């Protein structure tokens, strides 16, 4: 699992059946200072998210198993983060 920030939304005009009803967002991974790093990834999710929301997302094969039934995805949002506390 990774901590990330929603930075955009993806709108499909046509899609495969498995993606009907799915929301797609662009998510960037966050580092230990909650700064974005790397490049944005398209993540599937069951519920629309707002830009700037912090989320937990899964990548690789595990991402496909988030939905029931599984969807063909290599990145999925699995939860919304309400608060982050870092104790240095």
Regions found by a protein language model. Give the residues of each.
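A generic structural signal for residues embedded in beta-strands
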Residues: 6, 13, 57-58
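Short, conserved beta-turn/loop elements at beta-strand boundaries and strand-helix junctions
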Residues: 11-18, 82-86
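Short aromatic-glycine-enriched beta-strand elements
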Residues: 18-26
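Short, acidic/hydrophobic/Gly-rich beta-strand patch recurrent on exposed beta strands
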Residues: 25-29, 42-43, 56
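Short alpha-helix capping/helix-loop boundary micro-motifs
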Residues: 38-45, 63
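Loop/turn positions that initiate beta-strands
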Residues: 51-53
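C-terminal structural segments of small proteins and small subunits
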Residues: 56-88
